[in-house]
Design a protein with these regions (language model features):
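N-terminal beta1-alpha1 cap of cysteine-dependent amidohydrolase-like domains
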Residues: 1-108, 117, 124, 128-161, ...
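Active-site helix of classical SDR
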Residues: 111
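Short basic/aromatic active-site micro-motif
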Residues: 171
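Catalytic cores of DNA base-excision repair glycosylases
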Residues: 162-168
Length: 234
């Protein structure tokens, strides 16, 4: 590929009126790692997703609200937060197409959960009520500061990128992957057993992380390494 890769970044919702917006941290992280960011508003069907894919060399699934139980094929549980089904549909369509085409993909926070659901895995709708012995995963410190440690699986792409077996990460979630999709492995784990990273086997680049590396780009070398590895694969 000639020139810098163009990376699609899924837009987040900020209201029930379905207004969408880009997140500054994601845009700057892609630019600083050597890519060109392109914000993707919600798509409505596979054809629109295919049109988007003609423009991009990689895809970032961003953080945001909860995934609707409709897409989990479950009844809603106590503790579930605000859902935007339009965004859920869009990101699941984009993710499934990325998996089919082996387009480099990085899922962040909500993004790891979308990746798991789109690939046939499962998530906890609410960690405190479904995983009662968990640590606090919704930090009370500013998002650029690490909140807890995660262990990195040595036989993983994530380890080869970060070159560390333990890192400090921020934590801003109450949902998490509960079932790893077929063809994926767990690549990061919190001390309480919550899955913090998954990756697809034999993929060009397909990693989901539960933390927000884009918010720690200025302070944590492992965040820079993750984005650089992603851009190099695009």
């Amino acid at each position: 590929m000639l020139g810098k890769p163009i990376v699609g970044i899924t837009a987040a919702h900020c209201s029930e009126e379905l207004k969408t917006f880009p997140r500054h941290y994601y845009v700057e992280s892609i630019k600083n790692a050597g890519g060109i960011p392109l914000i993707i508003p919600p798509v409505r069907n596979t054809e629109e997703a295919k049109d988007v894919f003609q423009l991009i060399n990689g895809l970032v699934l961003t953080g945001g609200g909860d995934i609707s139980p409709t897409y989990l094929k479950e009844d809603p549980r106590r503790g579930i937060g605000t859902c935007f089904p339009e965004r859920d549909l869009s990101e699941i369509l984009l993710t499934q197409l990325a998996l089919q085409q082996d387009l480099p993909l990085l899922g962040i926070c909500r993004g790891i959960q979308v990746l798991a659901v789109a690939a046939g895995g499962g998530i906890y709708q609410d960690i405190p009520s479904q995983y009662p012995n968990s640590i606090l995963h919704s930090q009370t410190a500013p998002r650029q500061y690490p909140w807890h440690d995660v262990d990195i699986v040595e036989d993983s792409v994530l380890f080869r990128l970060l070159k560390k077996t333990k890192i400090g990460v921020n934590s801003l979630h109450h949902q998490a992957v509960s079932e790893i999709p077929q063809g994926f492995i767990q690549c990061a784990l919190a001390t309480d057993g919550i899955i913090e990273g998954i990756e697809k086997l034999r993929a060009k680049f397909c990693i989901g992380v539960q933390w927000h590396p884009e918010s720690m780009m200025e302070t944590e070398a492992h965040s820079k390494a993750l984005f650089r590895g992603f851009i190099e694969a695009c």
